[in-house]
């Protein structure tokens, strides 16, 4: 699909924009004062495939976390700053790779100037973060609620604060807890500027509902070519955010080094425990980086017939499964040996 044309913003070693792969982000959730826990979580996120990590900096004491993580983990860091412009300056001076602020609530004009100049000197981009829970009072009064138009007006106002200072090294995130509002706001904003967009649904919910809402909003926008970096926000282990984001990109054909895993919902023709077989196989294959399609099908109707385009798959029979490749039968395998058989055949591809 054709992506919306944007300029490039460099965040540490990761380039964000339409000329580059979509970057996956997450956020540390350990207490800022627990440096070891944050380092451990940052390492785990990088191993899971996270490209950029955001961390909250609620106090001056917490600024030390930036250098501690950068010494231990080679990954771009984004400082999440609220209200106190001095924290943004301190984070930039500490070597953070991007600063997330709302220029409209960071302080006076002089304080905004100080943040912008510090970021300009160090070539650090600013991420303007607008969400439905923190709109300016005057905008809420104008629209009555956080509509898509209200969110975009807020974002454009923040942009003006930066561009009036001739600062264009920024990107924008516009998020709502409502999936439709998120889609409408980003679609509207994308028509107005060429700056890169960070996509996400704020307060999306637990792993189950959060993934559904995020997939609807983020996936819908990506299908329209909108979006340059994403976060699947979840009330869950941040590792799940990263895995879900990569699975979403793979499902849309935007990542070519991941297994595309498909399985049928089963029916009365199925004579094997396909639920267990599919879960076990998916988990075992999730870390393999190969551009192939693997199908776990319940009977001969769905596979290898309907799944003939799969590079590899199994179709359930009477207490056993037929392993096939590109629609051609290979051999039969017992249910408890399906995962191992798939792993062995994948190694041959």
Question: Residue ranges of each PLM-predicted region?
Answer:
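Hydrophobic faces of well-ordered beta-strands that scaffold small-molecule active sites
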Residues: 22-28, 53-55, 77-81, 99-101, ...
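Active-site mouth loops of central-metabolism enzymes
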Residues: 19-37, 56, 75-83, 139-152, ...
């Amino acid at each position: 699909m054709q992506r919306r044309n944007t300029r490039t913003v460099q965040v540490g070693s990761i380039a964000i924009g339409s000329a580059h792969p979509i970057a996956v982000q997450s956020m540390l959730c350990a207490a800022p004062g627990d440096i070891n826990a944050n380092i451990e979580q940052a390492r785990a996120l990088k191993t899971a495939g996270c490209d950029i990590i955001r961390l909250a900096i609620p106090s001056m004491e917490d600024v030390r976390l930036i250098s501690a993580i950068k010494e231990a983990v080679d990954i771009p860091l984004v400082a999440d700053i609220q209200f106190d412009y001095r924290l943004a300056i301190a984070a930039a001076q500490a070597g953070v790779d991007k600063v997330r602020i709302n220029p409209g609530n960071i302080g006076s004009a002089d304080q905004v100037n100080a943040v912008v100049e510090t970021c300009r000197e160090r070539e650090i981009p600013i991420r303007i973060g607008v969400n439905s829970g923190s709109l300016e009072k005057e905008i809420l009064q104008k629209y009555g609620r956080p509509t898509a138009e209200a969110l975009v007006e807020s974002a454009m106002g923040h942009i003006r604060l930066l561009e009036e200072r001739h600062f264009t090294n920024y990107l924008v995130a516009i998020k709502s807890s409502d999936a439709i509002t998120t889609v409408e706001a980003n679609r509207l904003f994308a028509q107005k500027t060429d700056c890169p967009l960070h996509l996400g649904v704020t307060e999306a919910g637990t792993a189950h509902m959060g993934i559904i809402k995020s997939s609807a909003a983020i996936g819908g926008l990506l299908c329209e070519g909108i979006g340059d970096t994403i976060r699947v926000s979840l009330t869950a282990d941040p590792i799940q955010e990263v895995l879900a984001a990569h699975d979403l990109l793979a499902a849309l054909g935007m990542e070519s080094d991941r297994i595309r895993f498909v399985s049928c919902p089963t029916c009365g023709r199925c004579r094997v425990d396909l639920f267990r077989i599919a879960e076990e196989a998916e988990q075992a294959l999730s870390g393999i980086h190969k551009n192939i399609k693997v199908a776990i099908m319940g009977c001969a109707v769905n596979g290898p017939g309907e799944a003939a385009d799969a590079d590899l798959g199994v179709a359930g029979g009477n207490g056993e499964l037929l392993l096939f490749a590109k629609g051609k039968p290979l051999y039969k395998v017992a249910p408890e040996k399906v995962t191992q058989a798939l792993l062995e055949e994948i190694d041959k591809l």
